[in-house]
Amino acid sequence: MKFLVNVALVFMVVYISFIYAAPEPEPAPEAEAEADAEADPEAGIGAVLKVLTTGLPALISWIKRKRQQG
């Protein structure tokens, strides 16, 4: 079980680092002001939680199947 927890933590760190490492184009000053006014800080957290709740159980079940096979 400790192995699965370690694998899950590594998966999370790698996935989150890819999200934050992606380059984004510079927005125009007008668009940036509009985006700041409409920004939703909870949107990013929701996306991460969605990945964790859907991807992590699938990864764990895949690892369990591979361990049972070999």
From Swiss-Prot:
GO terms for molecular function: porin activity; protein kinase inhibitor activity; toxin activity. The modification Glutamine amide is found at residue 69. GO terms for cellular component: extracellular region; other organism cell membrane; pore complex. It is found in: Secreted; Target cell membrane. Residues 22-43 form a propeptide. One of its GO terms (biological process) is killing of cells of another organism. The record marks 57 as: Important for the flexibility at the center of the helix, flexibility that is important for the stability of the voltage-gated pore. This is Melittin. It comes from Apis cerana cerana (Oriental honeybee). The lineage of its organism: Eukaryota, Metazoa, Ecdysozoa, Arthropoda, Hexapoda.
